[in-house]
Amino acid sequence: QWLVRNSQKLDKPWLLAVNFVNPHDIMFFSSGEKQERSRANPRFMAPLRPPPNDPIYKKDWSHLPLPASFAKETLRDKPWCHRSYAQVIDSIYGHMDKDDEAAWLANQSYYFNCIRDVSRQVDHVLQALEDSGQLDNTIIVYTADHGEMAGAHGLRQKGPVTYKENSRVPLIVSHPDVSGGRTVNKLGSALDLVPTLVGLATEGTTTTDTPGVDLSPALTGQ
């Protein structure tokens, strides 16, 4: 709405941040009554809820297996912080029995459908960009704050741990003047977003004193 409403007045550089809550708040998904009853305080922050009544959430992904480490690993041989974190999560959001594979698969299906929902909303934003006439003059950055353990290594949510599942998130940059299709296998951080955006917008002629590194050279394979 902002893009369409203001497209004729955008005569100087602009930044639009579009933020989607889910799948971040997957911790409030209810896998069943057993999980709900095991919460230490059912009224803490928010109740657990089933998927929204939306066709996109009707898709069942239970034919896809859980992460391989879900069955292979247990918390017994993990560092203390893993077990402590799992206990806190169980207390706040309810316990999910590892033997209840159906509950974990339902949790995974909800997560996948949240991602599909985000894709649908991103399509709306891209369509608004095109309708506003700004699509070919806009740098688009798509990223996330963290991943989801989803049962990997016996954990869920993000956790005080560093695994591929919770630390490897998408960072996709589309630049109208740069050909796409390039994959760069280098580390980046959310701290790098501001200096990278400044570098892209000013073609590297301006820097900032904010933390982080300008990743814009990676667009051309540097």
State each model region's role.
Residues 6-12, 20-137, 141-187, 200-207:
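Active-site-proximal cap/lid insertion segments
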Residues 209-213:
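C-terminal lobe and pocket-closing loops
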Residues 222:
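Short beta-strand/turn segments that mark the catalytic/cofactor-handling region
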